[in-house]
Design a protein with these regions (language model features):
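A short, structure-level motif marking secondary-structure boundaries and short turns
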Residues: 152, 192-193
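Short, solvent-exposed beta-strand edge segments and adjacent coil->beta transition regions
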Residues: 188-190
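Long, contiguous binding/interaction regions
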Residues: 1-182, 186, 201-204, 208-235
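Helix N-cap motif at beta-to-alpha junctions
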Residues: 194-200
């Protein structure tokens, strides 16, 4: 049974002269106002660096020609005979996503903290809870457990407050975004923003404002990327 490896769904395209995973040629299948960008495969796609970068390169090339795409995650493939059925069944959802994402790209923003400094700052305002038990050994053990728990809770609360402040400063009219708290020893804020292509410079200026306002953190900004985090694709 033949399968196809899917890179993305896009606005209507005629053809693409590109190679993808396993050095396979890129093909275009049209359905009404949509195109599915794929490669025909008859073997398992290996999860190796070359294939991952080949997948990303196809999406990057499509971004360069200014076409709206709905990107699929690396490693997505289906039976060839199911393609048209899926396009028919989910056509309206795909069109809605295309319309929503038209003229926009995803930009990633990450905030990196010095965990030791944060820990010290939190400890300066931290009052350790006390449990009163007559058995000294058990009492000390429980107090230490409670202290560790409450301290971690305080750090999480601190990270949440800081992340929300950063997120609110970045958001502006026409920008949508979402973030997750990482709470690692290095990165605590990992966000994605959907930015209009003609507003990327404005977005960069806004990030510089945030950087100057939060000098205790380092910021890593990457993109533009295909809008992985802002399209609703389930096949």
């Amino acid at each position: 049974m033949n399968s196809i490896y899917i890179y993305c769904i896009s606005e209507k395209l005629d053809e693409l002269v590109l190679t993808g995973i396993n050095n396979l040629p890129i093909k275009v299948m049209q359905y009404n106002e949509l195109s599915i960008i794929y490669s025909s495969i008859n073997e398992e796609v290996k999860y190796i660096e070359e294939n991952f970068f080949a997948h990303e390169n196809v999406l990057d090339e499509l971004l360069k020609i200014d076409v709206t795409i709905l990107p699929f995650r690396f490693g997505t493939y289906i039976n060839e005979e199911d393609v048209i059925t899926i396009l028919k069944e989910k056509y309206n959802i795909f069109i809605e996503n295309i319309f929503f994402l038209k003229g926009r790209v995803e930009i990633s923003v990450r905030a990196i903290w010095n965990y030791s400094n944060v820990l010290e700052k939190v400890k300066n305002n931290f009052v350790a809870p006390q449990i009163g038990i007559s058995n000294e050994k058990i009492n000390n053990y429980l107090n230490k457990k409670m202290e560790d728990y409450k301290l971690n809770e305080s750090i999480n609360q601190y990270a949440t407050i800081e992340a929300e402040k950063i997120h609110k400063l970045i958001l502006d009219n026409g920008i949508e975004g979402k973030y997750i708290l990482m709470k690692t020893d290095s990165m605590f804020f990992n966000a994605s923003y959907l930015v209009k292509k003609n507003k990327i410079n404005d977005f960069s200026s806004r990030i510089q404002f945030v950087v100057s306002d939060f000098t205790e953190y380092k910021f890593l900004v990457t993109g533009p990327w295909p809008p992985y985090n802002f399209c609703n694709l389930l096949i």
